[in-house]
């Protein structure tokens, strides 16, 4: 029996524009970060903002928007990722560029880390509650970027994050990751709970979709024979 370990599913890069400066490192299976991880992330991790470390995961998110950090922390935790992400954006304007660009960068990192999707489940679905709120997420590693998001949020803001940006963040992530996602909050009175249950459901569905299937190594989970085009 072969004891060869699968290749790491990780990515690290910086994304700099006139609007945002982002550094990101992602490991879809938890554990260590790639050797090319930007040294600036070490400072962010040491700061301890939205940070959690265990034997299986390291998570540190610092975007300058507290509620966005909270949502991405939940996404990484329940997807089983190690994620280090730091952003300095033009928050003196508003939260749009920062929230959008961070989720685009996360989607690109996801796609790069995933590579050619062979030997994987491909599909994932999950329901996640948070007290009175219940959300459902369905994910397809389709290479066909599409998102349908209905969270039913009523407040203008949660913390410093505009609620209109919360579904937009999921759209931005799905587009850059080149996946199909459907995320719905089915019930709930508290907008914080509605949003958080949605991100947790997305996390669990994504973890399921990216899981390796024993005995199907190298197989493409598609009748088309490829998910690369």
From Swiss-Prot:
InterPro entries: IGPD_sf, ImidazoleglycerolP_deHydtase, ImidazoleglycerP_deHydtase_CS, Ribosomal_Su5_D2-typ_SF. Keywords: Amino-acid biosynthesis, Histidine biosynthesis, Lyase. GO terms for molecular function: imidazoleglycerol-phosphate dehydratase activity. Disulfide bonds: none annotated. Pathway: Amino-acid biosynthesis; L-histidine biosynthesis; L-histidine from 5-phospho-alpha-D-ribose 1-diphosphate: step 6/9. Pfam families: IGPD. GO terms for biological process: L-histidine biosynthetic process. It comes from the Eukaryota. Its EC number is 4.2.1.19. The keyword Nucleotide-binding does not apply. It catalyses: D-erythro-1-(imidazol-4-yl)glycerol 3-phosphate = 3-(imidazol-4-yl)-2-oxopropyl phosphate + H2O. Belongs to the imidazoleglycerol-phosphate dehydratase family. This is Imidazoleglycerol-phosphate dehydratase. It comes from Neurospora crassa (strain ATCC 24698 / 74-OR23-1A / CBS 708.71 / DSM 1257 / FGSC 987).
């Amino acid at each position: 029996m072969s004891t060869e370990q699968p290749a790491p599913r990780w990515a690290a890069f910086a994304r700099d524009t006139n609007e945002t400066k982002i550094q990101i490192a992602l490991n879809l299976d938890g554990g260590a970060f790639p050797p090319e991880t930007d040294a600036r992330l070490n400072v962010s991790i040491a700061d301890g903002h939205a940070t959690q470390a265990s034997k299986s995961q390291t998570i540190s998110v610092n975007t300058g928007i507290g509620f966005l950090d909270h949502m991405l922390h939940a996404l990484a935790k329940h997807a089983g990722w190690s994620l280090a992400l730091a952003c300095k954006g033009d928050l003196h304007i508003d939260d749009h560029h920062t929230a959008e660009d961070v989720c685009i960068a996360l989607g690109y990192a996801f796609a790069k880390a995933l590579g050619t999707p062979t030997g994987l489940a491909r599909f994932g679905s999950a329901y996640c509650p948070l007290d009175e709120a219940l959300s459902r997420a369905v994910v397809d590693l389709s290479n066909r970027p599409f998102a349908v998001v209905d969270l039913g949020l009523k407040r203008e803001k949660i913390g410093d994050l505009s609620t209109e940006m919360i579904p937009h963040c999921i759209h931005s992530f799905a587009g850059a990751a080149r996946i199909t996602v459907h995320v719905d909050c089915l019930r709930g009175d508290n907008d914080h709970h509605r949003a958080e249950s949605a991100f947790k459901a997305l996390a669990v569905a994504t973890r399921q979709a990216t899981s390796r299937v024993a005995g199907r190594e190298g197989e493409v989970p598609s009748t088309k024979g490829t998910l690369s085009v």
